[in-house]
């Protein structure tokens, strides 16, 4: 037997009958398993000790020989070899079949290998193998062709005419004879000749046959081995039988399947010995064939064999197949050593690169390291002693543990791991309790929250693994999201709220307009309660020593607030002083308007100046993200992660000080809500009257009503937001981006608005109450549809999205950066991606980080901005767009010439690091994960364009699947194949609409269904490939009409939506 742990590769192929017999340790002749009284295996049965080895170590069946000293002896009474019982995992048996049987994989698989080799259809094969027809093996003088099928009656006729002069057989025997006659070399020659002359269907078939014939010839397997004469039986330990508590037995399904084969085989042998009538023998042979089929692949043909409770039995193929099969479950999905899992809790005091490990868990995970260290330090005398010390948890163990885990990173993983940020490395610190502590800023990357989520810990053992974890996977290194290059570690919730509150300004704050010499004075004044965080003050600009201030600015007073001074202490020194949430302040310097010349102040001093000035907006979540991105671009990763930690601490500190909470009193109801509702109610009445008088259709009435109520909700929302106090806690939460949005607030204080029915159609009766007032029973009932659909969708979506990701990774995993430059002369023309007026992805974002394909000059000054094959940095991208250029050719993976994968220049920069991409980077997998990861957030619903109107247009996750599978989309759009002018739009028969396009040389008309919305007008010029109706374009048509580049761009745009 091969050594399980020591082999280089595995070859899978056909086994000859001799090979099967050589594996076997004996023939299984009886279907019995074990004796129910003695509980010993039956002799010659499926668990026989003589064939498969002893059930107890070093002991024969009858008990004559016990002990190791008889190793290798064969007992003369029971015939069992004295050896280890482990051999029952590797010794195989066999069954000598009384009639040849076809192997279902080779006959039923797609394409049927047997069918291709014999040039017979799978249908014909099935008729022969399952004893419905005869096949001619040797035609003799009959004038029949070899491989012709004959029915029972036809066979009789020929047999009467030509007795004993021709051979026709039924069942696998006939097929075996035909397979034995095949001369592979001859067949190969004939097929090669056919390839040269054949066309169409015959050519494809010849190619497929050639593949099979060549494979057989190269592998040295004989075609006739696809028919089994001997059936191997896998070792008994792999199909175990165990006794349950009640004296019953639980057994592997394979035993049942083997039992049926043995029973039928024995019966067939007996019938043959008795010389039974042909028809009975035929029936038995067919049943044997079906039993073997069920054993190899149950359910592949006909109804599956079922066990108790109508459950299909698990055959050999099912053991290997699918997610629960041997490959994906046990070989690719092993459980690993040195790992643990626990609930996560937030660790606000941790540094970016740290995580908290519970003491008990750390001790168990690092046990061997601790034991070695204990022995080295001579705290323990030997390993055994060290082990007992650890188990007792002696005091000295903890000191050693702290030493051991220092600088030894661990990996934290949260399932589902949707992208590479689902596993990151941290340096462990020991914590009390039993929960793993997680740094609050990495929660976004893991998509984790602290409502009971669990995470797994893994310990990298080797020095290489530790180095890799530290260099590549440390959380402090993974600040950018690989899918778009934006920071993924932005503060959230409390941290955002704290920083927002800190940078807020108020008109009525205490001692507004006080002027200070330097920041230390400000902090002292704040500590003593002289000024508030929100107080607007002046500070002498020169005292900041800020390198970005101009000489002019240094002579003036900087108008700022106490909170902003505290906030700016966390920003690196050489950065501009951030006084207002604008890109200008971030990228260049603090704007001049924030500096005041003290000589120009009037009688009331700075206070009077502030009274006439507008308040500056506080810093919200988006702006904090911009600060992080800017710091990351200009400083090192270390500086960025240190600043992130300081921002986090600041946020937590001041959100605690602010004590922002939500109470019922914070929800202020709009006084003139009823008036707005009444106005819109009148509008609805008017529409209903028009409908009753037959002036408008049902569809128009429905759409108008929906529009009226949507407008009512928008109006209420607008007025609510206007009337809200800027320091209202709920407003602060939504404005800062910490939690909630305007719509949530409208539902609390204004009205809930329109709801969707289970079908997705919008119910035209709105919910006019808000949560503050309380819903009526009917309103509550209507709103439960949405909630329930939400839950059902989420469950289905997760599985679909995961499956899509899996298929995408499968396809894209070989796309690796293989070379520096493929030298292509083609490029891709890029510009803004827009849908109507809505911007999906602006031009500047599409070119940044890519390589240019052409020289770009400034249209006015004619200076060269960039040359071909140069990287477009953010600065250059800004120059290009500032120059008014709206499109350009860039290097793209679409046009890359690399034989396998892509090249560095066509790919552009690595978004996860912001550096240029290196050869060997698995960019295909990154792309697949970047599409798959947001998949879970996409909506599942088929969006109805206002219910009745228009046809359904798929959106969200199903649309993404449609694109990648190149299916014909639902709600297909009509496109024009010629360039010209829309001449006419009219009704055609069957309630269809006809659009006539007149070109220079020809006129074409297109039919659209009666419900589609036409988006062109009479007299409008259209280009080739332009869309005439709403909907999604079918990619295959578009390819033939508009060409490759247009189709690539269209698919790209659709995915980005």
From Swiss-Prot:
<comment type="function">
    <text>DNA-dependent RNA polymerase catalyzes the transcription of DNA into RNA using the four ribonucleoside triphosphates as substrates.</text>
</comment>
<feature type="binding site">
    <location>
        <position position="822"/>
    </location>
    <ligand>
        <name>Zn(2+) 2</name>
    </ligand>
</feature>
<dbReference type="InterPro" id="IPR045867">
    <property type="entry name" value="DNA-dir_RpoC_beta_prime"/>
</dbReference>
<dbReference type="InterPro" id="IPR007081">
    <property type="entry name" value="RNA_pol_Rpb1_5"/>
</dbReference>
<feature type="binding site">
    <location>
        <position position="451"/>
    </location>
    <ligand>
        <name>Mg(2+)</name>
    </ligand>
</feature>
<dbReference type="GO" id="GO:0000428">
    <property type="term" value="C:DNA-directed RNA polymerase complex"/>
</dbReference>
<feature type="binding site">
    <location>
        <position position="62"/>
    </location>
    <ligand>
        <name>Zn(2+) 1</name>
    </ligand>
</feature>
<keyword id="KW-0460">Magnesium</keyword>
<dbReference type="Pfam" id="PF04998">
    <property type="entry name" value="RNA_pol_Rpb1_5"/>
</dbReference>
<feature type="binding site">
    <location>
        <position position="896"/>
    </location>
    <ligand>
        <name>Zn(2+) 2</name>
    </ligand>
</feature>
<dbReference type="Pfam" id="PF04997">
    <property type="entry name" value="RNA_pol_Rpb1_1"/>
</dbReference>
<dbReference type="InterPro" id="IPR044893">
    <property type="entry name" value="RNA_pol_Rpb1_clamp_domain"/>
</dbReference>
<feature type="binding site">
    <location>
        <position position="449"/>
    </location>
    <ligand>
        <name>Mg(2+)</name>
    </ligand>
</feature>
<feature type="binding site">
    <location>
        <position position="78"/>
    </location>
    <ligand>
        <name>Zn(2+) 1</name>
    </ligand>
</feature>
<dbReference type="GO" id="GO:0003899">
    <property type="term" value="F:DNA-directed RNA polymerase activity"/>
</dbReference>
<keyword id="KW-0804">Transcription</keyword>
<comment type="similarity">
    <text>Belongs to the RNA polymerase beta' chain family.</text>
</comment>
<dbReference type="InterPro" id="IPR007083">
    <property type="entry name" value="RNA_pol_Rpb1_4"/>
</dbReference>
<keyword id="KW-0862">Zinc</keyword>
<feature type="binding site">
    <location>
        <position position="453"/>
    </location>
    <ligand>
        <name>Mg(2+)</name>
    </ligand>
</feature>
<keyword id="KW-0548">Nucleotidyltransferase</keyword>
<feature type="binding site">
    <location>
        <position position="75"/>
    </location>
    <ligand>
        <name>Zn(2+) 1</name>
    </ligand>
</feature>
<feature type="binding site">
    <location>
        <position position="906"/>
    </location>
    <ligand>
        <name>Zn(2+) 2</name>
    </ligand>
</feature>
<dbReference type="InterPro" id="IPR007080">
    <property type="entry name" value="RNA_pol_Rpb1_1"/>
</dbReference>
<keyword id="KW-0808">Transferase</keyword>
<dbReference type="GO" id="GO:0006351">
    <property type="term" value="P:DNA-templated transcription"/>
</dbReference>
<dbReference type="InterPro" id="IPR042102">
    <property type="entry name" value="RNA_pol_Rpb1_3_sf"/>
</dbReference>
<comment type="subunit">
    <text>The RNAP catalytic core consists of 2 alpha, 1 beta, 1 beta' and 1 omega subunit. When a sigma factor is associated with the core the holoenzyme is formed, which can initiate transcription.</text>
</comment>
<keyword id="KW-0479">Metal-binding</keyword>
<dbReference type="GO" id="GO:0003677">
    <property type="term" value="F:DNA binding"/>
</dbReference>
<dbReference type="InterPro" id="IPR006592">
    <property type="entry name" value="RNA_pol_N"/>
</dbReference>
<dbReference type="Pfam" id="PF04983">
    <property type="entry name" value="RNA_pol_Rpb1_3"/>
</dbReference>
<dbReference type="InterPro" id="IPR038120">
    <property type="entry name" value="Rpb1_funnel_sf"/>
</dbReference>
<feature type="binding site">
    <location>
        <position position="903"/>
    </location>
    <ligand>
        <name>Zn(2+) 2</name>
    </ligand>
</feature>
<protein>
    <recommendedName>
        <fullName>DNA-directed RNA polymerase subunit beta'</fullName>
        <ecNumber>2.7.7.6</ecNumber>
    </recommendedName>
</protein>
<dbReference type="Pfam" id="PF00623">
    <property type="entry name" value="RNA_pol_Rpb1_2"/>
</dbReference>
<dbReference type="InterPro" id="IPR007066">
    <property type="entry name" value="RNA_pol_Rpb1_3"/>
</dbReference>
<feature type="binding site">
    <location>
        <position position="60"/>
    </location>
    <ligand>
        <name>Zn(2+) 1</name>
    </ligand>
</feature>
<dbReference type="InterPro" id="IPR012754">
    <property type="entry name" value="DNA-dir_RpoC_beta_prime_bact"/>
</dbReference>
<dbReference type="InterPro" id="IPR000722">
    <property type="entry name" value="RNA_pol_asu"/>
</dbReference>
<dbReference type="Pfam" id="PF05000">
    <property type="entry name" value="RNA_pol_Rpb1_4"/>
</dbReference>
<keyword id="KW-0240">DNA-directed RNA polymerase</keyword>
């Amino acid at each position: 037997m091969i050594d399980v742990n020591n082999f280089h590769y595995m070859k899978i192929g056909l086994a000859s009958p001799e090979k099967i017999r050589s594996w076997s340790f004996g023939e299984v002749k009886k279907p019995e398993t074990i004796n129910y009284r003695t509980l010993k295996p039956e002799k010659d049965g499926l668990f026989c000790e003589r064939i498969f080895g002893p059930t107890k170590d070093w002991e024969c069946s009858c008990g004559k020989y016990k002990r190791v000293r008889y190793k290798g002896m064969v007992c003369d009474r029971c015939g069992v070899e004295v050896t280890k019982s482990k051999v029952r995992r590797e010794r195989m048996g066999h069954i000598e079949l009384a009639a040849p049987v076809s192997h279902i994989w080779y006959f039923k698989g797609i394409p049927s290998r047997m069918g291709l080799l014999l040039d017979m259809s799978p249908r014909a094969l099935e008729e022969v193998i399952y004893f419905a027809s005869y096949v001619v093996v040797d035609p003799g003088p009959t004038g029949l062709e070899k491989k012709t099928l004959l029915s029972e009656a036809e066979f009789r006729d020929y047999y009467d005419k030509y007795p004993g002069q021709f051979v026709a057989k039924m069942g696998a025997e006939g097929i075996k004879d035909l397979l034995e006659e095949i001369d592979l070399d001859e067949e190969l020659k004939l097929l090669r000749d056919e390839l040269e002359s054949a066309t169409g269907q015959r050519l494809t078939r010849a190619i497929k046959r050639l593949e099979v014939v060549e494979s057989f010839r190269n592998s040295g397997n004989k075609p006739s081995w696809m028919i089994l004469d001997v059936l191997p039986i896998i070792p008994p330990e792999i199909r175990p039988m165990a006794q349950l508590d009640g004296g019953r037995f639980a057994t592997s399904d394979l035993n049942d399947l083997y039992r049926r084969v043995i029973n039928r085989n024995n019966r067939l042998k007996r019938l043959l010995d008795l010389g039974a009538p042909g028809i009975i023998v035929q029936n038995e042979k067919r049943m044997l064939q079906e039993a073997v089929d069920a054993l190899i692949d149950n359910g592949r043909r006909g109804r599956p064999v079922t066990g108790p409770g109508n459950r299909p039995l698990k055959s050999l193929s099912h053991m290997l197949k699918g997610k629960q099969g041997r490959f994906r479950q046990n070989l690719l999905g092993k459980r690993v050593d040195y790992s643990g899992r626990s609930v996560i809790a937030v660790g606000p005091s941790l540094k970016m690169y740290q995580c908290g490990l519970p003491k008990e868990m750390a001790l168990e995970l690092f046990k061997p390291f601790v034991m070695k260290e204990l022995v080295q330090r001579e705290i323990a005398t030997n390993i055994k002693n060290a082990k007992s010390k650890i188990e007792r948890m002696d005091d000295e163990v903890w000191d050693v543990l702290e030493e051991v885990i220092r600088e030894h990173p661990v990996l934290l993983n949260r399932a589902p791991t949707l992208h590479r940020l689902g596993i990151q490395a941290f340096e462990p610190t020991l914590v009390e309790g039993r929960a793993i502590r997680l740094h609050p800023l990495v929660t976004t990357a893991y998509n984790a929250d602290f409502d009971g989520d669990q995470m797994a810990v893994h310990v990298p053992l080797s020095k290489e693994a530790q180095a890799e974890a530290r260099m590549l996977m440390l959380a402090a290194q993974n600040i950018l999201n690989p899918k778009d290059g934006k920071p993924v570690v932005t503060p959230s919730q409390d941290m955002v709220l704290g920083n927002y509150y800190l940078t807020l300004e108020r008109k009525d704050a205490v001692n507004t307009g006080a002027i200070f010499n330097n920041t230390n004075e400000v902090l002292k004044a704040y500590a003593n309660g002289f000024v508030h965080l929100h107080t607007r003050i002046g500070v002498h600009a020169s005292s900041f020593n800020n390198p970005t201030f101009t000489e002019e600015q240094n002579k003036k007073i900087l108008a700022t607030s106490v909170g902003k001074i505290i906030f700016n202490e966390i920003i690196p020194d050489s950065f501009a002083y951030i006084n207002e949430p604008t890109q200008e302040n971030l990228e260049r310097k603090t704007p001049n308007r924030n500096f005041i010349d003290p000589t120009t102040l009037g009688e009331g001093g700075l206070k009077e100046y502030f009274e006439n000035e507008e308040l500056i907006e506080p810093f919200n979540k988006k702006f904090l993200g911009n600060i992080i991105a800017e710091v990351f671009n200009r400083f090192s990763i270390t500086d960025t992660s240190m600043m992130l930690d300081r921002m986090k601490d600041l946020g937590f500190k001041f959100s605690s000080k602010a004590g922002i909470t939500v109470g019922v009193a914070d929800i202020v109801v709009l006084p003139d809500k009823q008036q707005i509702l009444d106005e819109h109610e009148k509008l609805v009445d008017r529409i209903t009257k028009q409908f009753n008088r037959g002036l408008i259709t049902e569809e128009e009435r429905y759409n108008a009503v929906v529009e009226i109520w949507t407008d009512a909700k928008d109006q209420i929302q607008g007025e609510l937001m206007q009337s809200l106090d800027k320091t209202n806690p709920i407003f602060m939460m939504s404005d800062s981006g910490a939690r909630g949005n305007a719509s949530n607030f409208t539902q609390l204080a204004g009205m809930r608005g329109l709801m969707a029915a289970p079908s997705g159609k919008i119910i035209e009766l709105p919910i006019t109450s808000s949560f503050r007032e309380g819903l009526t029973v009917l309103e509550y009932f209507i709103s439960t549809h949405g909630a329930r659909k939400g839950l059902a969708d989420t469950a289905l979506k997760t599985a679909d999205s995961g499956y899509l990701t899996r298929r995408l990774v499968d396809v894209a995993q070989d796309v690796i950066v293989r070379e520096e430059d493929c030298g292509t002369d083609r490029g891709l023309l890029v510009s803004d991606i827009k849908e109507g007026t809505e911007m999906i992805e602006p031009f500047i974002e599409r070119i940044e980080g890519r390589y240019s394909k052409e020289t770009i000059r400034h249209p006015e000054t004619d200076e060269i901005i960039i040359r071909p094959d140069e990287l477009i940095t953010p600065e250059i991208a800004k120059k290009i767009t500032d120059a008014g250029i709206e499109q350009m050719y860039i290097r793209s993976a679409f046009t890359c010439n690399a034989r396998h994968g892509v090249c560095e220049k066509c790919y552009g920069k690595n978004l996860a690091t912001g550096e240029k991409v290196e050869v060997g980077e698995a960019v295909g997998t990154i792309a697949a994960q970047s599409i798959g990861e947001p998949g879970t957030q996409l909506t599942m619903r088929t969006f109805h364009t206002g219910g009745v109107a228009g046809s359904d247009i798929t959106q969200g996750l199903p649309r993404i699947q449609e694109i990648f599978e190149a299916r014909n989309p639902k709600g297909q759009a009509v496109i024009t194949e010629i360039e010209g002018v829309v001449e006419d739009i009219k009704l055609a028969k069957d309630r269809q609409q006809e659009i006539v396009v007149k070109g220079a040389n020809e006129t074409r008309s297109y039919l659209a269904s009666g419900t589609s919305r036409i988006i062109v007008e009479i007299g409008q010029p259209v280009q080739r490939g332009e869309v005439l109706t709403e909907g999604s374009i079918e990619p295959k048509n578009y390819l033939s009409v508009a060409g490759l580049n247009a189709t690539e761009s269209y698919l790209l745009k659709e995915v980005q939506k």
